[in-house]
A protein has these predicted regions:
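Catalytic domains of carbohydrate-active enzymes, especially glycoside hydrolases
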Residues: 1-4
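Residue-level signal for short, function-critical loop segments
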Residues: 6-7, 127
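Active-site gating/metal-coordination segments in enzymes
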Residues: 7-102
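Catalytic pocket-lining loop regions of alpha/beta-barrel enzymes
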Residues: 57-58, 71-178
């Protein structure tokens, strides 16, 4: 399977519709709808209609770019609904950042409260949480519901090798997602 993320754009509904059309034509694609919990509906009923009924299977959040704290009260309501529907959350908070992005909201340690509050909610830290990779290692070691992907753009070829070796040494190889 291949996870395909809806992009970070002002018209999230159109982005999700386009992604829905794409995954319906590509059986190996697993679509993650974009949502901003401070602006979009966040109940289980609304998520079912806007996500599951469109053959999308997860949610992607752009906290830094859309300038909301990952543990904002409306975001916590979203996570509760996502856990109820078994929808994983992909946190795509990595470079390149716009000048308006709030980098503090990109820090993986901000996800600790969410992981503790919703231990069954599957969460993926995009691009290993770059540039805050050490925080991602801590989360992966602490929470069994945390995963990370390796779609980083390394400055040096050996950086990805070092990440994989660090995951092996930390005993979290089973929580890495490989991608490009």
């Amino acid at each position: 399977a291949c996870i395909v993320l809806a992009g970070c754009q002002a018209d999230r509904r159109s982005a999700n519709e386009a992604l829905s059309d794409y995954v319906r034509q590509n059986s190996k694609a697993v679509g993650f709808a974009t949502v901003n919990p401070t602006e979009d509906p966040v109940t289980a009923r609304q998520l079912k209609k806007e996500v599951l009924d469109k053959d999308l299977r997860g949610l992607v959040l752009y906290c830094a770019e859309e300038r909301f704290h990952p543990a904002h009260s409306r975001a916590m309501n979203l996570y509760e609904a996502a856990a109820e529907l078994n929808l994983p959350i992909f946190f795509h908070n990595c470079p390149p950042f716009s000048q308006q992005a709030v980098m503090d909201y990109a820090r993986p340690f901000q996800l600790d409260e969410i992981a503790r509050t919703f231990p069954t909610l599957k969460m993926i830290v995009g691009r290993m949480g770059f540039p805050f990779i050490e925080q991602t290692w801590c989360l992966l070691g602490k929470h069994e519901n945390m995963f990370a992907d390796l779609t980083i753009i390394p400055q040096k070829v050996w950086e990805v090798y070092n990440l994989v070796m660090s995951a092996y040494e930390a005993g979290v190889m089973d929580r890495l997602l490989f991608g490009s």
